[in-house]
Regions:
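Extended glycan-interaction surfaces of carbohydrate-active proteins
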Residues: 2-34, 57-88, 92, 116, ...
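N-terminal beta1-alpha1-beta2 module of alpha/beta enzyme domains
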Residues: 20, 29, 33-41, 45, ...
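Residues within HEAT/ARM-like alpha-solenoid scaffolds
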Residues: 90, 110-117, 153-156, 174-181, ...
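Well-ordered alpha-helical scaffold segments within catalytic/enzyme domains
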Residues: 1-3, 41-55, 94-111, 156-174, ...
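Active-site neighborhood of glycoside hydrolase catalytic domains
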Residues: 152-196
Length: 335
């Protein structure tokens, strides 16, 4: 596909996302679906990349209004109310990445100042679950009791969110040495003590995100990152189709394929990144959205009739990462 064609495609995908935004500013997965803070931020980043500043600003205003006093958000919201009463550490810190990307694109310093208390609260909630080993517990339940497990994927994302939080603080003339220190503790734990992660009993290591997220967030880079990706390529990739969500499922997903594409773009493998994007183009629907995934080799859309806003956001982010340049290239996690 040409750059112009990709531009038209992501503009239609942005229309799809914006068309699902509620008057409150929340961006649910689909009509009458739930809104979770992490995917909501991913959609806001995608809207920013397409110049939809009004919609993205409303998305962040929703986050500001729904943030809990302790800096967290509930896991899901629906019809304006909390749906699942858990507080995810990754959800709370990820707002920093979204706010920083909005600033990089819009250059709106007033927005950065207005969102600072939200960012500060979210990150401080997350760091309240960091352990001396560097790991950050997954979440707290409705009783405020921590879930004593640290998924590698969410920990990698928290690492990047902390770096973005430090950048926000610096842009505002503030110091945040404890955030920088916390990010380095996470990095050391991931690089030196991987056995500390994914200890809850679930086979989280069988998920593609655990494979590529340390590369996507810059925890593994250079030739080591390329070797890391090659090491499990044959396990997760179905040639011509995309990336499996998990090893035990016979389907590939657009979101995972796009995140892997971003990871490849980050380490300079842009041609391979574009190839992955080409593979998911058949899942682009007439309304601008993308089907969540497809069963292989049958080629049957799966789950049936599901087109999520965050899937379209993933396509936008990956497209910019693979064909963009300058600061906006890899803007999902880099800036």
């Amino acid at each position: 596909m040409t750059v112009q064609t990709f531009g038209e495609l992501i503009d239609r995908a942005a229309d799809f996302i914006a068309g699902h935004q509620l008057p409150s500013g929340a961006i649910p997965w689909y009509r009458d679906g739930v809104t979770d803070p992490w995917d909501h931020v991913a959609c806001a980043i995608a809207l920013d990349l397409c110049g939809r500043f009004e919609e993205s600003t409303r998305a962040y205003e929703w986050l500001s209004k729904t943030q809990n006093p302790d800096g967290s958000w509930w896991y899901y919201y629906q019809d304006g109310l909390p749906k699942e009463m858990a507080k995810d550490s990754n959800h709370s810190s990820y707002v920093a990445t979204g706010v920083w990307q909005h600033y990089l694109i819009s250059k709106d310093m007033d927005f950065l100042r207005q969102m600072w208390p939200v960012v500060e609260g979210g990150i401080n909630f997350t760091l309240g679950m960091q352990q001396p080993s560097g790991v950050v517990w997954w979440a707290r339940d409705y009783k405020d009791e921590a879930w004593p497990s640290a998924p590698l994927t969410t920990s990698s994302c928290i690492y990047q969110s902390l770096l973005d939080g430090v950048k926000i603080a610096k842009a505002l003339g503030l110091d945040s040495p404890e955030w920088d220190e916390a990010s380095q503790k996470i990095a050391r734990a991931i690089r030196e003590k991987p056995e500390l992660f994914d200890t809850a009993g679930d086979n989280l290591r069988g998920y593609a995100m655990n494979w590529y997220y340390p590369v996507l967030t810059g925890l593994i880079d250079g030739e080591r990152a390329r070797e890391h990706i090659r090491g499990e390529w044959g396990e997760f990739i179905v040639e011509g189709w995309g990336c499996k969500c998990s090893l035990d499922q016979p389907w590939v997903t657009v979101a995972e394929t796009c995140e892997l594409s971003m990871a490849l773009a980050r380490i300079g493998e842009t041609q391979q990144a574009k190839t992955l994007l080409d593979w998911v183009m058949p899942l682009h629907d007439a309304d601008g959205g993308f089907w969540t995934g497809v069963r292989v080799p049958e080629g049957i859309v799966y789950p049936p009739d599901e087109k999520t806003t965050w899937t379209s956001a993933g396509v936008i982010l990956a497209t910019v990462a693979s064909i963009g340049d300058g600061e906006l290239s890899n803007t999902h996690l880099k800036g």
